[in-house]
Amino acid sequence: MIKIKRWYLPQCTLGVLTVNDFRCFTLELPMLDNAPNISCIYAAGGFRGNKHFSPHNGDVVAINNVMDRTNIQIHSGNYISQIRGCILVGDSIKFLDSDNIPDVTNSKATLAKLLKELPDSFNIEIT
């Protein structure tokens, strides 16, 4: 099971993702009433996830059963500008660019490690 514990900032949503003994950080869009492409996932709760290949993002985690949303993924990327409603993962949170919004680092390597920890299908708990 993936567990994501989030905290909300005006310009983004940050979190800590754990599965087994693996831990990383998450970056999402801010909370904007669950509006597609501009908001993080509105509802905390339980979801189903599975490993998936996305033509746009490569190997990802697909998050299913998200109310009023489709095609939600955990994928690689470092900056808030690379998100359209999905979740980015990284091994640390830093300010990498000049927009004064936190970023995540080493995202591709972090996603690869996460995918190795997961079975093909699993539960996701977001709080």
What are these regions (language model features)?
Residues 1-103, 108-122:
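Cell wall/extracellular polymer interaction/catalysis modules
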Residues 123-127:
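Low-complexity intrinsically disordered segments
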